[in-house]
A protein has these predicted regions:
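An extracytoplasmic/periplasmic, membrane-proximal ligand-sensing/linker region
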Residues: 35-39, 229-230, 256-258, 264, ...
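A short beta-strand structural signal in non-transmembrane regions
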Residues: 276-282
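Structural beta->alpha junctions
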Residues: 47, 282-286
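Conserved hydrophobic/amphipathic secondary-structure segments
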Residues: 28-276, 343, 347-351
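Sec/Tat signal peptide C-region and signal peptidase I cleavage site
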Residues: 21-27
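N-terminal export leaders
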Residues: 5-10
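Bacterial N-terminal signal peptides
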Residues: 11-20
Length: 352
């Protein structure tokens, strides 16, 4: 048995060693930390969609702007509409700058809504920025071009309706379809349970669905051939205060209501689009590494070569920094409680 005095001495020495190691880690420069390192880019979605495409786009480019030029490797970790990845980013992953994530745009708002599946505070995450603030994008209600419905106004007429698809209960496409029906008063039937946009597009082509609600950049990226051949007709655009220049004749959701309560609900629902393609790291990473990641992200977004690559992929680039994301989250948190309660009621039951 080790004598008590010796055990105490060992404990003191161990504490000194741990403190020294921690001090050495703090003394390590950002470049030294990242040089030769593999950084993990977590994506809270399955391969193939816009979240995966943009994550791999950033993974290809971001390392060149981080001191030490680390390699960035993408890991898809889908689950609970992106909540699972955000929870792990906040509670599980190392807080040393070696893990970053492409989060679903609605995930920060779910925390404000009080979603019981959320176990993170979006105000404490280390936000790198967002590729898009939706300045050049819109969330479109689309039908096939051959559909007899030509405008959103027709959907207020007796006997005229469309059937839209959606995936899980709290997905943006399903929520905005419900808002169009229950808040804007459009004659819409909603069928849920589709596993993403691609199966819904197939259902539209087979005549099982009339349409869906999806981002302009997403449909141009995922359905490039059909879009270029004018296979779809937009009826309505969300996520914008004014009409996108590409759709000067298509009304916004706000144009279809004069009710202040409905407008406030739309404002809250559309806040997610201001941080449309967000990237974050865990809270509490060393300040110099956080700053390096944030600076690198915005430098990447300003590089003409990167912008050219984004254009080829159909990624809408209107970047904002991490501070702007925090401002949008604060604005959402200031929403009157009654509006959030109404929004949650429209969003329906929690995810399956």
């Amino acid at each position: 048995m080790i004598p008590a005095r010796r055990r105490a001495a060992i404990a003191i020495c161990s504490g000194i060693a741990v403190a020294a190691a921690a001090g050495a880690a703090r003394a390590q420069s950002v470049e030294q930390f990242y040089k030769g390192r593999q950084v993990t880019m977590v994506v809270g979605a399955a391969p193939g969609g816009i979240n995966d495409i943009t994550a791999r786009f950033v993974a290809r480019h971001l390392g060149a702007y981080i001191p030490g030029h680390p390699t960035i490797v993408v890991q898809n970790q889908p689950g609970a509409g992106g909540i699972a990845a955000a929870n792990r980013l906040y509670n599980v992953f190392e807080r040393d700058g070696s893990v970053i994530a492409k989060l679903e745009r609605a995930v920060p708002m779910l925390a404000i809504q009080g979603d019981p599946n959320v176990s993170f505070d979006p105000r404490r995450l280390t936000w790198l920025g967002s590729l898009s603030s939706y300045a050049k994008d819109a969330y479109l209600m689309l039908v096939m071009a051959a559909n007899p419905i030509k405008s959103a106004d027709e959907l207020r007429q007796p006997g005229k309706s469309i059937t839209l698809g959606g995936d899980n209960a709290a997905s943006s496409n399903l929520i905005f379809a419900t808002i169009a029906k229950d808040v804007l008063g459009l004659n819409i039937n909603v069928v849920r349970g589709y596993a993403g946009a691609a199966p819904m597009f197939l259902a539209m082509q087979r005549g099982e669905l009339d349409g869906q609600i999806i981002g302009y950049s997403s449909v141009r990226t995922g359905q490039r051939d059909l879009w270029s051949h004018h296979a779809f007709r937009p009826l309505l655009q969300f996520g914008r205060a004014t009409r996108l220049a590409d759709f000067p004749d298509i009304p916004t959701g706000h144009e279809l209501t004069k009710d202040p309560t409905a407008s406030a609900l739309l404002d809250f629902a559309e806040l997610q689009f201001l941080i449309s393609l967000p990237f974050a790291a865990p809270p509490g990473i060393p300040a110099d590494r956080a700053q390096a990641l944030q600076t690198a992200f915005m430098a990447m977004c300003a590089d003409p070569a990167v912008l050219d690559d984004a254009e080829k992929l159909g990624i809408e680039m209107s970047p904002i920094d991490g501070e702007t994301i925090l401002g949008s989250i604060a604005r959402a948190a200031a929403t009157p409680h009654a509006v959030i309660v109404r929004y949650n009621a429209l969003a329906g039951p929690q995810r399956d």
